[in-house]
Amino acid sequence: MGKYRVIAGQNLYDIALHIYGSIEGIVDLMMCNTDLSLDTTLKVGDELIYSDEFIINADVVAYNEMHGIVPSNGEHHVYPKVFTKPLAVAFALPTQILSVQCSVSGVGTLEIDWGDNSDTEVITLTDKPQLLKHIFDNKVRKRRRIRWFTDAYFKQVDWSGLQPTSVVILRPLPIEELTIKDATLTLDSLQMVTGIYSLNLSGLTSGNLKPLVECRELMTLNLTDARIKPTVLDDWLIAMVERYGNRRNCEVTLTAVPTGTYQEPARNADTGHYNITSGMEAIWVITHEESWNEGGKWKFIINDKEYSV
């Protein structure tokens, strides 16, 4: 007699096809395992006894062995998933990812569609961050998608473990502290995040930081080890001066360095306005404009060197 160990996603028919080359092999499985029935729910690691010299279709068995195929179809949803909250965020992930995780805290309810055959996961948010882990039960040919349905208020959110290639926020989303580390992303959707005062984008790869200009409530911005061109930093910093408006003072941490010299820029002879030509000049203006530093001082930390007044 042989022993067969069940793997993820397998049902009784998968195992019969793998061992005997035909689903008719379930008869032998139930004869060898008297407590087994068509209603039995198999779990990963379960062991089944089978007649090791009994094969119904040798060609199928040989083909599976030759191509390394292990039947694993599992159970699939027949009916659409139902959600009670509005669609708030859509993520796109690389196809090769097998498992993900994220953490959340706040007030309200979050419904997650993991984009596979699993049921909707419903999370009641609490003040303490909850680590959510998921192993995908299917394969996809194109990008994998995850959807969040919620109208909750989030205190802390960490999307780093999702490894997203795209984040699309579809409605105003209140988040106090957001972390997305080591991601390659466009940041346009961050304009839909409200009430955010701490943003950790360390390790970010992006070709445009201008969407950050609209994050006016930020008090902490971490861009450590971000792979960003100096000219991209320049465009963001200059745009922030030009569209400063009503915003909080912020502590910005960088390892990439903007162009230029930290000095007062020249003024336009006609208007008297600064003619800013580099990112470092923009930082000088931000840190030296008195009205922008009344409630608290702006601080830029670039490779451990502090620029402030």
Spans of model-derived segments:
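Membrane-proximal C-terminal cap and juxtamembrane stalk of leucine-rich repeat ectodomains
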Residues: 248-309
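Cell-surface/extracellular proteins and modules involved
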Residues: 1-111, 118-203, 207-224, 235, ...
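C-terminal low-complexity, glycine/proline- and small-hydrophobic-enriched intrinsically disordered tails
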Residues: 226, 242-243
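Leucine-rich repeat
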Residues: 228-237, 266, 274
